[in-house]
């Protein structure tokens, strides 16, 4: 019997670009291959361990953020250590893998490298063909006794006669089976039990997971410990779980495992799962089980030794648990748990019982404890649906206005016209330097400007003075002048002339290297606006000396491990007169604390510091994956930081709700807008429930959107401002500037093509125009080379030109502040996009809001569906990309220029500096980290404690210390 193909799919350490990896997994499954996706941010050791335990026939690696040469070398070495030196390894990474690197990679041991413009489906079919033709067979070429455990389990699955029932281990481990409906949280519960086993014992544990999609390993974040063995078993529709698992479990009992946990597939009501082939069973359920009659039908509920009701955060869980207890026997144990919460007391109690029944020698005093509070009260979970209702009521209120209301609106419009209206009459105007000023209430207002051809045009465009009342009502309710509610055309009345919207993204290698680039970009600009890109190690809360990660040091951004790195990074800048953007999310509070501590050392006044830091954890869980901790403590830390900075650093924006990375993950423009605004409104709910003043903290919000090529990007900023304004004023009662949404834009990285990259210059210029016409508050324009390298200095200056030429050379933005406002086409598109956003709000509301929707995989599912749709459109030619699938030149040559790479010596220097900092501050760091943990497990402000901790501890040390008391982020698919 031929074994089925089994692929391990992963992305390397500090690489969260999982869109392609997830797509490959889906395609492999569609082609009938067993695909085990183990996730993103995986070390070479973790990939090799998974490949060994799963007895994979091939490995597929998707790598997109550099460092692949060194990483793949480590992977080949790790595979040889696992006796997998012959396993086929396939690698893809867009333009980041260069053509000249293919031969060295294949010489290293990589089977094949895939590059654009090859379609993913073609690549997958090619991989399958290569593996089918491959003479390699890890299992069949060896005797059963000499095979690894992973290979033995494969052999047993193919020929059950190999199953050993020997008595060489008289004290057999206790085998526990876990059954229950799909979605009960069995995988998370098992993983948390594994953690407690590792903490309290010195033994080893095996986990067997039966699943049609082989997807459970993704959530098992503790399975990579050397004392854990995990095997996934595919049980398809109609297949017998017991037959598939019996011989495998029997074989595992012949190895020195102290405990074996077996997860069954999701069960129907009359099914007993694996209960007949294990020593004892645990039935997992949730409070959402239906009626009591349903309980009587649950076969495993009546026969299991332990009953677990997971998802205790369900509002009726206590009442529901009392009902369930009436249906179980006195001999059955019952536990109410919340497995997703690190240190959950219910899971601790469950583990104690399981350990006792399994005769494990444990130390319960070492069990983690926590007491997380829900970020949003249950009675507030309909906020998005209520906001949609508020929007609809707002527009409906203008449909049947009373005469006195119409008179008020007419008077309001007349006042606006008297201030800013221009009808061509130049009398009574003062003219200076091509600007006509009107005297109103002792104030001179610039109402017209003279073009290069001598035509006078209004500074603010608006309806004619004698416009109909219907036109005026629509104008004031949906548009209005820039800087006035509902802020459709802009958060401010005028574009700033003393400060261009340029905020170029820079970061590379060592802090001093990036510092040099900053000074280059700031040259000629009176008030510099710096945007800082960090390397992937920093983004994942790791240090440059992290084991197995040297390839990532300084790649794609600057390496910042300590406060000393932060001092080097901004050396020579007057931070009180510099606006600094920090592109950081997971470890954002740590980086922000380092920035403040460094500024304090330099003598800068915190109250004069200006800038933005992203801090948005929602989009990490929805799209980008740079998260370190579970959601609840992450939100607590963010709220601590916002609360602290509102007072201590009042001119700083402590959170930038980001849609850009959602778009980069594959969301369409409407999804990006809707998800981002929903996230922003969720932060409002979180901070409001904390007792903070909505009027004040919303002033500190900023947003970050893509500016792409699709039609909807013509109005994305306009619609964002309008939806936000109506929600904030009409629903939350905000009267001040918090209702005026401010946002940064970046041209679409996803739209850039590695094939014929010079076309990217045109793409970026088009997208810059979209952003500027949306009146973005700041803008980063990508370099045309960014699909395959970090931009050189000339590339950055060229990218800056794509926004400077429209601003300086064209007249689009120098005369009329709202040039396109009132266009019939744009107005229709605005309304259509707004309605589409409302529909998505309602979908999220049906999930219970953003947080439950994250847990239910709503966002990732929606994004992946969009990715599949786009991939299909590109494949069949429905969507045309110049140079890729339409009008290709068939030239593979790239523009000349050196590829920007970080020298090995620079990486070594950074690693050595970090090690020296740690050694120098060893004792002080130990004490400060202990104090930080004490605050993190109490009610204190963790961010305030961080500001002290960063004086002596590194980013990685802080991440590890908080993970010990808060737990680690658990991905899902």
Name each model-derived stretch:
Residues 52, 138, 360-539, 803-804, ...:
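Flexible, glycine-rich loop/tail regions that form catalytic "lids" or insertion modules at the edges
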Residues 65-67, 441-708, 712-713, 731, ...:
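Catalytic alpha/beta active-site cores
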Residues 104-126, 302-361:
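Canonical P-loop GTPase G-domain recognition
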Residues 158, 162-173, 179-184, 188-270, ...:
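Nucleotide-state-sensitive switch-loop elements of NTP-binding domains
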Residues 221, 267-332:
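Conserved C-terminal guanine-recognition region of P-loop GTPase G domains, centered on the G4
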Residues 121-175:
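Extreme N-terminal, non-catalytic leader segments
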Residues 14-16, 21-123:
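Cofactor-cradling patches in redox/metallo enzymes
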Residues 35-39, 62-64, 227-243, 286-289, ...:
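Flexible beta-alpha connector loops of hexameric P-loop NTPases
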């Amino acid at each position: 019997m031929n074994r089925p193909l089994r692929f391990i799919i992963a992305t390397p350490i500090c690489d969260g670009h999982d869109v392609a990896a997830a797509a490959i997994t889906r395609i492999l499954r569609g082609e009938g291959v067993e695909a085990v996706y183990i996730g993103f941010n995986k070390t070479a050791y973790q990939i090799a361990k998974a490949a060994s335990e799963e007895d994979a026939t091939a490995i597929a690696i998707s790598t997109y953020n550099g460092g692949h040469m060194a990483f793949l070398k480590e992977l080949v070495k790790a595979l040889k250590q696992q006796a997998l030196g012959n396993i086929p390894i396939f690698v893809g990474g867009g333009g980041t893998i260069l053509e000249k690197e293919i031969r060295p990679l294949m010489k290293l041991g990589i089977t094949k490298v895939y590059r654009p413009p090859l379609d993913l489906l073609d690549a997958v079919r090619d991989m399958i063909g290569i593996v089918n033709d491959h003479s390699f067979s890890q299992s069949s070429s060896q005797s059963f006794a000499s095979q690894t455990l992973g290979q033995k389990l494969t052999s047993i699955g193919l020929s059950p006669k190999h199953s050993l029932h020997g008595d060489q281990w008289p004290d057999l481990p206790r085998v526990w089976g876990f059954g229950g409906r799909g979605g009960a949280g069995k995988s998370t519960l098992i993983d948390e039990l594994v953690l407690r086993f590792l903490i309290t014992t010195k033994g080893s544990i095996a986990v067997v997971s039966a699943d049609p999609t082989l997807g459970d390993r993704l959530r098992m974040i503790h399975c990579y410990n050397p004392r854990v063995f995990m095997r996934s078993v595919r049980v398809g529709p109609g297949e017998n779980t017991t037959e598939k698992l019996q011989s495998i479990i029997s074989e595992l009992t012949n190895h020195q495992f102290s405990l074996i946990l077996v997860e069954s597939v999701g069960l129907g009501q009359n099914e007993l799962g694996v209960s007949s082939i294990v020593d004892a069973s645990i039935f997992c359920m949730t409070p959402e089980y239906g009626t009591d009659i349903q309980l009587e039908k649950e076969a495993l509920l009546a026969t299991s030794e332990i009953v677990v009701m997971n998802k205790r955060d369900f509002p009726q869980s206590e009442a529901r648990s009392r009902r369930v207890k009436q249906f179980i026997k006195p001999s059955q144990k019952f536990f109410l748990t919340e497995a997703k919460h690190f240190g959950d007391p219910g899971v601790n109690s469950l583990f104690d019982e399981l350990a006792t029944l399994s005769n494990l020698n444990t130390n319960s005093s070492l069990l983690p404890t926590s007491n997380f509070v829900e970020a949003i009260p249950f009675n507030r979970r309909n906020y998005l649906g209520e906001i949609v209702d508020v929007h609809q009521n707002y527009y409906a209120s203008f449909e049947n206005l009373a005469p006195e209301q119409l008179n008020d609106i007419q008077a309001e419009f007349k006042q606006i016209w008297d201030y800013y209206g221009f009808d061509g009459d130049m009398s009574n105007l003062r003219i200076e330097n091509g600007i006509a000023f009107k005297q109103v209430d002792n104030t001179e207002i610039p109402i017209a400007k003279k073009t290069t051809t001598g035509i006078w045009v209004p500074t603010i465009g608006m309806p004619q003075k004698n416009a109909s009342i219907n036109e005026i009502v629509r104008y004031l309710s949906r548009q209005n002048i820039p800087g006035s509610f509902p802020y459709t055309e802009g958060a401010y009345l005028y574009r700033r002339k003393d400060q261009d919207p340029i905020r170029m993204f820079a970061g590379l290698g060592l802090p001093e290297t990036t510092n040099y680039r900053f000074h280059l970009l700031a040259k000629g600009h009176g008030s510099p606006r710096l945007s800082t890109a960090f390397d992937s190690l920093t983004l994942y809360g790791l240090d440059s000396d992290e084991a197995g990660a040297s390839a990532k040091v300084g790649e794609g951004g600057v390496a910042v491990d300590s406060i000393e790195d932060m001092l080097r990074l901004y050396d020579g800048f007057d931070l009180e007169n510099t606006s600094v953007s920090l592109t950081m999310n997971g470890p954002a509070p740590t980086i922000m604390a380092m920035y403040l501590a460094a500024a304090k050392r330099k003598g800068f006044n915190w109250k004069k510091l200006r800038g933005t830091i992203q801090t948005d954890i929602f989009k990490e869980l929805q799209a980008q994956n740079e998260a370190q901790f579970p959601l609840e403590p992450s939100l607590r830390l963010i709220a601590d930081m916002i609360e602290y900075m509102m007072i201590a650093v009042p001119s700083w924006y402590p959170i930038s709700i980001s849609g850009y990375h959602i778009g980069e993950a594959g969301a369409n423009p409407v999804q990006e807008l809707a998800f981002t605004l929903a996230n922003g409104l969720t932060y409002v709910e979180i901070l409001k429930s904390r007792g903070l003043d909505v009027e004040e903290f919303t002033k500190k919000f900023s947003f970050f959107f893509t500016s792409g090529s699709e039609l909807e990007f013509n109005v994305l900023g306009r619609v964002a401002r309008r939806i936000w304004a109506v929600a904030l004023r009409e629903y939350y009662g905000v009267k001040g500037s918090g209702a005026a949404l401010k946002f940064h834009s970046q041209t679409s990285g996803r739209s850039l093509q590695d094939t014929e990259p010079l076309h990217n210059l045109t793409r970026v210029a088009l997208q810059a125009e979209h952003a500027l016409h949306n009146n973005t508050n700041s803008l980063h324009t990508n370099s045309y080379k960014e699909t395959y390298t970090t931009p050189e200095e000339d590339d950055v200056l060229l990218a800056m030109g794509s926004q400077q030429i429209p601003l300086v050379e064209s007249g689009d933005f120098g005369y009329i502040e709202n040039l396109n406002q009132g266009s019939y086409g744009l107005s229709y598109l605005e309304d259509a996009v707004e309605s589409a956003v409302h529909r998505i709000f309602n979908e999220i509301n049906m999930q219970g809001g953003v947080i439950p929707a994250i847990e239910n995989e709503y966002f990732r599912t929606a994004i992946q569906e969009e990715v599949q749709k786009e991939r299909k459109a590109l494949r069949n030619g429905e969507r045309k990309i110049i140079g890729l699938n339409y009008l290709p030149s068939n030239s593979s040559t790239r523009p000349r220029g050196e590829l920007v790479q970080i020298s090995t010596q620079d990486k070594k220097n950074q690693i050595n500096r970090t090690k020296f900092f740690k050694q120098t501050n060893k004792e002080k760091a130990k004490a400060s980290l202990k104090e930080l943990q004490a605050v993190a497990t109490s009610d204190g402000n963790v961010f305030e404690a961080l500001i002290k901790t960063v004086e002596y501890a590194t980013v990685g040390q802080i991440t590890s210390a908080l993970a010990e008391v808060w737990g680690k982020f658990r991905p899902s698919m």
